[in-house]
C-alpha cells in the first residue's frame, strides 16, 4: 500500500491534505495536484430510488422524446442565456467543455498538448470515497482508470481517458446488433463485471450507459462510473440499497424488504443488457410503473424466434426469478454461445428486412418517464 501525494499546481511541492487515501500497489496511483481556487461545477448524483421513478419506454428512445430524461435547468448565470448549458471553464492546464449528452461529464482539453480527457467533479470532502473503487480494483482492460486528480478549495476534478460514446446510444442507433457483434461486446461487459465481483465490488446500478467505447472503431469497451458501486467485506454481498434503473431492476429488489445478493442482481442486469443488444428493446416494459414492476416480479418475457438457441439459453440463464439459479459472472464467460458465435465461419441468421429494424418507440400519453 502507498499514499498518493498531493502536489501544488503552482509549485509542484507535495502538501498534506486531510486524511490520507491509501492506494493499492496493484493499480497505478493517479497524479494529483492542488489548486488555489476552483469554479462551481455540478456533482454526479445517484440514480433516484425506484419508488421515485416512472418506467422506461419499450424501445430505446431518442434524445428529446417524452421518454428521454430531460437535462436539469442550468444554474443562474451559467452559460449564455436562460436555460442554456454551462459554458467552458478553465481548471489548471485544462479547458472544460460540458457534454450536453453526458450529464456531469465534461470534455477536458489540455491547453499545452491538445490531449483530450473526460472530467468529473466531486465535493472535496467526498472525492476520496467516490474514487475508492477505482483505486481498489486491479487494472483491467475493460474498466476505466483515473488519469489525474486536481484538488481545488471545495471541489476535486477527476480526469479519465477519452471515450467514443456509450453502449446505450450505440444500440439505439443500430436498432439491434447481430449476434457476432453482440457476443464480442457482451463478453467484454461480462469480463469487467466478473473482475469487479472477484475484487469484492458490486456494481448495483448496472446498465448499458455505463459502458463506453475505448476506440473510434467501437470494438473495445470499458466500464465507467464506479462512483456508486458497493465495496464488499469478504464474501458477503448482501445489499439493501434500492437505487437503480427500473428497466434493469431484479425481482428480488422489488420483493425484498431486507437484503438481497448484489452479485446476483448484477447478473440479472446483464441479462437485460444481453436481451436489449439482441432484440433492440427491454425484456420488461410498460408505461405504468406498477405494471412494469409486476411484469418483472413474474419474470415472464418473450424472445423473438430469430435469436439462436444458445443465445436464448444464455438469456434465460440470467433472467431467472430465483437469484440462486442464475449463472455467476465468471460462469457466463464459459457459456458455449460465445464460442459458437465467435468461431470462424459463423453466419448470423436473419429472417427478413422488416424484422431487422426495431421501430422507434411511440408514446401517446404525455408521461415523464425515468430512463437510464
UniProtKB/Swiss-Prot annotation:
<dbReference type="InterPro" id="IPR024104">
    <property type="entry name" value="Tribbles/Ser_Thr_kinase_40"/>
</dbReference>
<comment type="subunit">
    <text>Monomer. Interacts (via protein kinase domain) with CEBPA. Interacts with COP1.</text>
</comment>
<dbReference type="InterPro" id="IPR000719">
    <property type="entry name" value="Prot_kinase_dom"/>
</dbReference>
<dbReference type="GO" id="GO:0046329">
    <property type="term" value="P:negative regulation of JNK cascade"/>
</dbReference>
<comment type="function">
    <text>Adapter protein involved in protein degradation by interacting with COP1 ubiquitin ligase. The COP1-binding motif is masked by autoinhibitory interactions with the protein kinase domain. Serves to alter COP1 substrate specificity by directing the activity of COP1 toward CEBPA. Binds selectively the recognition sequence of CEBPA. Regulates myeloid cell differentiation by altering the expression of CEBPA in a COP1-dependent manner. Controls macrophage, eosinophil and neutrophil differentiation via the COP1-binding domain.</text>
</comment>
<dbReference type="GO" id="GO:0055106">
    <property type="term" value="F:ubiquitin-protein transferase regulator activity"/>
</dbReference>
<dbReference type="GO" id="GO:0031665">
    <property type="term" value="P:negative regulation of lipopolysaccharide-mediated signaling pathway"/>
</dbReference>
<feature type="compositionally biased region" description="Pro residues">
    <location>
        <begin position="59"/>
        <end position="75"/>
    </location>
</feature>
<dbReference type="Pfam" id="PF00069">
    <property type="entry name" value="Pkinase"/>
</dbReference>
<dbReference type="GO" id="GO:0045645">
    <property type="term" value="P:positive regulation of eosinophil differentiation"/>
</dbReference>
<dbReference type="GO" id="GO:0031434">
    <property type="term" value="F:mitogen-activated protein kinase kinase binding"/>
</dbReference>
<keyword id="KW-0649">Protein kinase inhibitor</keyword>
<dbReference type="GO" id="GO:0005737">
    <property type="term" value="C:cytoplasm"/>
</dbReference>
<dbReference type="GO" id="GO:0043409">
    <property type="term" value="P:negative regulation of MAPK cascade"/>
</dbReference>
<dbReference type="GO" id="GO:0019901">
    <property type="term" value="F:protein kinase binding"/>
</dbReference>
<feature type="region of interest" description="Disordered">
    <location>
        <begin position="1"/>
        <end position="23"/>
    </location>
</feature>
<dbReference type="GO" id="GO:0014912">
    <property type="term" value="P:negative regulation of smooth muscle cell migration"/>
</dbReference>
<dbReference type="GO" id="GO:0043405">
    <property type="term" value="P:regulation of MAP kinase activity"/>
</dbReference>
<feature type="short sequence motif" description="COP1-binding">
    <location>
        <begin position="355"/>
        <end position="360"/>
    </location>
</feature>
<dbReference type="GO" id="GO:0031625">
    <property type="term" value="F:ubiquitin protein ligase binding"/>
</dbReference>
<dbReference type="GO" id="GO:0045659">
    <property type="term" value="P:negative regulation of neutrophil differentiation"/>
</dbReference>
<comment type="similarity">
    <text>Belongs to the protein kinase superfamily. CAMK Ser/Thr protein kinase family. Tribbles subfamily.</text>
</comment>
<dbReference type="GO" id="GO:0004860">
    <property type="term" value="F:protein kinase inhibitor activity"/>
</dbReference>
<dbReference type="GO" id="GO:0048662">
    <property type="term" value="P:negative regulation of smooth muscle cell proliferation"/>
</dbReference>
<dbReference type="GO" id="GO:0045651">
    <property type="term" value="P:positive regulation of macrophage differentiation"/>
</dbReference>
<feature type="domain" description="Protein kinase">
    <location>
        <begin position="91"/>
        <end position="338"/>
    </location>
</feature>
<dbReference type="InterPro" id="IPR011009">
    <property type="entry name" value="Kinase-like_dom_sf"/>
</dbReference>
<dbReference type="GO" id="GO:0061629">
    <property type="term" value="F:RNA polymerase II-specific DNA-binding transcription factor binding"/>
</dbReference>
<dbReference type="GO" id="GO:0140416">
    <property type="term" value="F:transcription regulator inhibitor activity"/>
</dbReference>
<protein>
    <recommendedName>
        <fullName>Tribbles homolog 1</fullName>
    </recommendedName>
</protein>
<dbReference type="GO" id="GO:0005829">
    <property type="term" value="C:cytosol"/>
</dbReference>
<dbReference type="GO" id="GO:0032436">
    <property type="term" value="P:positive regulation of proteasomal ubiquitin-dependent protein catabolic process"/>
</dbReference>
<dbReference type="GO" id="GO:0005634">
    <property type="term" value="C:nucleus"/>
</dbReference>
<dbReference type="InterPro" id="IPR024105">
    <property type="entry name" value="TRB1_pseudokinase_dom"/>
</dbReference>
<dbReference type="GO" id="GO:0000122">
    <property type="term" value="P:negative regulation of transcription by RNA polymerase II"/>
</dbReference>
<feature type="region of interest" description="Disordered">
    <location>
        <begin position="52"/>
        <end position="86"/>
    </location>
</feature>
<dbReference type="GO" id="GO:0032496">
    <property type="term" value="P:response to lipopolysaccharide"/>
</dbReference>
